[in-house]
């Protein structure tokens, strides 16, 4: 597991109040992890803070699973 992947999973677990073991790549925030729309907004903000990136609203709406969040972070974090 990459450092970015581990950090994303930790943030998701903290933001959604679930065990880190439950946060697997294929899980959807709403359907599988019980997030609501406010949770997803707060999650995006936490990812922005953690990685020092800005996620535009139109991109944030597409980030609906753990893997999509990991991919977005990997593709947008400056090395």
UniProtKB/Swiss-Prot annotation:
InterPro entries found in the cross-reference section: ACP, ACP-like_sf, PKS_PP-bd, PP-bd_ACP, Ppantetheine_attach_site
Residues carrying O-(pantetheine 4'-phosphoryl)serine: 37
Biological process (GO), any one: lipid A biosynthetic process
Boundaries of every Carrier domain copy: 2-77
Annotated SUPFAM superfamilies: ACP-like
PTM field: 4'-phosphopantetheine is transferred from CoA to a specific serine of apo-ACP by AcpS. This modification is essential for activity because fatty acids are bound in thioester linkage to the sulfhydryl of the prosthetic group.
Biological or metabolic pathway of the protein: Lipid metabolism; fatty acid biosynthesis
UniProt keyword terms in alphabetical order: Cytoplasm, Fatty acid biosynthesis, Fatty acid metabolism, Lipid biosynthesis, Lipid metabolism, Phosphopantetheine, Phosphoprotein
Subcellular location: Cytoplasm
Principal location: cytoplasm
Family annotation (Pfam families): PP-binding (PF00550)
HAMAP family per record: Acyl_carrier (MF_01217)
Family according to the record: Belongs to the acyl carrier protein (ACP) family.
Protein known as: Acyl carrier protein
Annotated organism of origin: Leptothrix cholodnii (strain ATCC 51168 / LMG 8142 / SP-6) (Leptothrix discophora (strain SP-6))
